[in-house]
């Protein structure tokens, strides 16, 4: 049991009581009101601290931490075909594990408590997630390139991943079904992905409408835009869908997104860095679409700090629309907390009694957070993402900025070694 006293919580100075993996009580003077005379009670001084819900990163590729800075300033297809996919061919489970450890640490240290990931060498990712204590939604990223034999192998990998994760019976690790995109996946793979998501009652996670060229490719193959094509065979029906990017959308596609309750993962920094464009978030908001935030992978961002996405998501749409009132600080903050949790069906993202105890504690005695009067504005527009403490599922995983159960230096050392192996193999 954890009691944090006299912290700023939901704009008030009060206490928060965590029991097991839930927020039990929020209020003043809880130590007296709750008769907290227990040996297992850990009391934390919350003075000069603000407590916020843990951030939810709804689209990333965590092991791509080792791709940070290796292929900058390139268009998407050049970036993928000539750099990323060539390097990925040299990955193995150990490299992916080392990269995942680094990525999970980076997310935790910048206040992310849950992430939604699509990649491969899933055992390495699962191991890293378990050791760091972060909450994760994990999918094997399927690409069949319209080849029947490869399709069967990809689907088999997904079934194995889903069933292996479910067998863990770990509430912090959840499976998804994750076909890469319509331009890399056959209709048969996409249809079977939908069937598997329904069968196992897990979310679908996919990239859609990231670039104009990608949309043209799908139109040439199907005579339809991506959302129209997927909707034509029921891909969105009866399942929870998280769609990443959604940069270039027709009015008809926005109608499909709205009517099918598709959750949008907005990745503004990656979209800007790859010059993919700017997603029409204000228009989607007008249509009551659920907007969430993702970082994408470190190869195209180049970090996993969701506070940077929160700031960018608010600023870019003001500048793009010439309207300073669109995407307010509070709305952008909700994208990364409440909305992200809702998209994944997670009882988190808000500091309310009964919610999962995924919380972040930030020291507000910092020059860039003073004066404290408009602290939530500061968290969006002036905070650097360095947090003091992180609690996930009721367990402290970061204390005073340091990982509790992880040797940080060893993680850095192993990541450097794996990067050198990856780079040397790629050069051969």
From Swiss-Prot:
Reaction catalyzed: 5'-deoxyadenosine + H2O + H(+) = 5'-deoxyinosine + NH4(+); S-adenosyl-L-homocysteine + H2O + H(+) = S-inosyl-L-homocysteine + NH4(+); S-methyl-5'-thioadenosine + H2O + H(+) = S-methyl-5'-thioinosine + NH4(+); adenosine + H2O + H(+) = inosine + NH4(+)
The entry's keywords: Hydrolase, Metal-binding, Zinc
A molecular function GO annotation: S-adenosylhomocysteine deaminase activity
Enzyme Commission number(s) of this protein: 3.5.4.41, 3.5.4.31, 3.5.4.4, 3.5.4.28
Cofactor details (free text): Binds 1 zinc ion per subunit.
Residues the record lists as binding substrate: 88, 180, 210, 296
Cofactor(s) this protein requires: Zn(2+)
Pathway: Amino-acid biosynthesis; S-adenosyl-L-methionine biosynthesis
A Pfam family of this chain: Amidohydro_1
InterPro entries per record: Amidohydro-rel, Deaminase_MtaD/DadD, Metal-dep_hydrolase_composite, Metal_Hydrolase, MTA/SAH_deaminase
One BP annotation, GO: S-adenosylmethionine biosynthetic process
Binding, Zn(2+): 59, 61, 207, 296
Catalytic class of the enzyme: hydrolase
Family per record: Belongs to the metallo-dependent hydrolases superfamily. MTA/SAH deaminase family.
Purpose: Catalyzes the deamination of three SAM-derived enzymatic products, namely 5'-deoxyadenosine, S-adenosyl-L-homocysteine, and 5'-methylthioadenosine, to produce the inosine analogs. Can also deaminate adenosine. The preferred substrate for this enzyme is 5'-deoxyadenosine, but all these substrates are efficiently deaminated. Likely functions in a S-adenosyl-L-methionine (SAM) recycling pathway from S-adenosyl-L-homocysteine (SAH) produced from SAM-dependent methylation reactions.
Additional observations: SAH is a product of SAM methyltransferases and is known to be a feedback inhibitor of these enzymes. As a result of this inhibition, organisms have evolved efficient enzymes to metabolize SAH via different pathways. The pathway found in methanogens differs from the canonical pathway, it uses the deamination of S-adenosyl-L-homocysteine to form S-inosyl-L-homocysteine for the regeneration of SAM from S-adenosyl-L-homocysteine. 5'-deoxyadenosine is a radical SAM enzyme reaction product which strongly inhibits radical SAM enzymes.
Subunit-level organization: Homotetramer.
Name of the protein described by the UniProt record: 5'-deoxyadenosine deaminase
Organism of provenance: Methanococcus aeolicus (strain ATCC BAA-1280 / DSM 17508 / OCM 812 / Nankai-3)
Lineage, opening ranks: Archaea, Methanobacteriati, Methanobacteriota, Methanomada group, Methanococci
Gene: dadD
């Amino acid at each position: 049991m954890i009691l944090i006293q006299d912290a700023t919580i939901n704009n008030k100075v009060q206490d928060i009581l965590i029991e097991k993996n839930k927020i039990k009580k929020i209020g003043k003077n809880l130590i007296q009101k709750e008769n907290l005379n227990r040996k297992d009670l850990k009391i934390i001084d919350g003075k000069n601290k603000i407590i916020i819900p843990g951030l939810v990163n709804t689209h990333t590729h965590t092991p791509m931490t080792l791709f940070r800075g290796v292929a900058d300033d390139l268009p998407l297809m050049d970036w993928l075909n000539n750099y990323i996919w060539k390097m990925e061919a040299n990955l193995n489970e150990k490299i992916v594990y080392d990269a995942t450890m680094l990525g999970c640490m980076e997310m935790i240290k910048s206040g992310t408590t849950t992430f939604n990931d699509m990649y491969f060498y899933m055992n390495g990712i699962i191991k890293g997630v378990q050791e760091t204590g972060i909450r994760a939604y994990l999918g094997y990223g399927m690409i069949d390139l319209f080849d029947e034999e490869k399709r069967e192998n990809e689907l088999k990998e997904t079934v194995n991943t889903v069933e292996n994760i479910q067998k863990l019976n770990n509430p912090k690790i959840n499976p998804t079904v994750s076909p890469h995109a319509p331009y890399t996946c056959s209709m048969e793979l996409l249809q079977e992905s939908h069937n598997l998501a329904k069968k196992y009652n897990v979310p679908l996670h996919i990239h859609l409408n990231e670039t104009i060229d990608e949309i043209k490719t799908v139109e040439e193959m199907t005579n339809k835009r991506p959302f129209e094509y997927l909707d034509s065979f029921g891909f969105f029906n009866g399942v929870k869908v998280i769609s990443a990017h959604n940069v270039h959308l027709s009015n008809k596609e926005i109608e499909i997104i709205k009517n099918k309750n598709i959750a949008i993962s907005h990745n503004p920094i990656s979209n800007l860095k790859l010059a993919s464009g700017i997603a029409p978030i204000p228009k989607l908001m007008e249509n009551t679409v659920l907007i969430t935030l993702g970082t994408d992978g470190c190869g195209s961002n180049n970090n996993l700090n969701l506070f940077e996405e929160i700031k960018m998501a608010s600023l870019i749409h003001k500048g793009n629309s010439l309207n300073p009132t669109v995407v307010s600080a509070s709305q952008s903050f909700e994208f990364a907390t409440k909305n992200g949790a809702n998209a994944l069906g997670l009882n988190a993202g808000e500091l309310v009694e009964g919610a999962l105890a995924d919380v972040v504690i930030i020291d507000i005695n910092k020059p860039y957070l003073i004066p404290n009067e408009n602290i939530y504005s500061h968290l969006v527009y002036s905070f650097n993402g360095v947090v003091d403490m992180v609690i996930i599922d009721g367990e402290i995983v970061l204390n005073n900025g340091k990982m509790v159960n992880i040797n940080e230096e060893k993680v850095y050392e192993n990541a450097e070694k794996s990067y050198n192996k990856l780079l040397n193999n790629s050069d051969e």
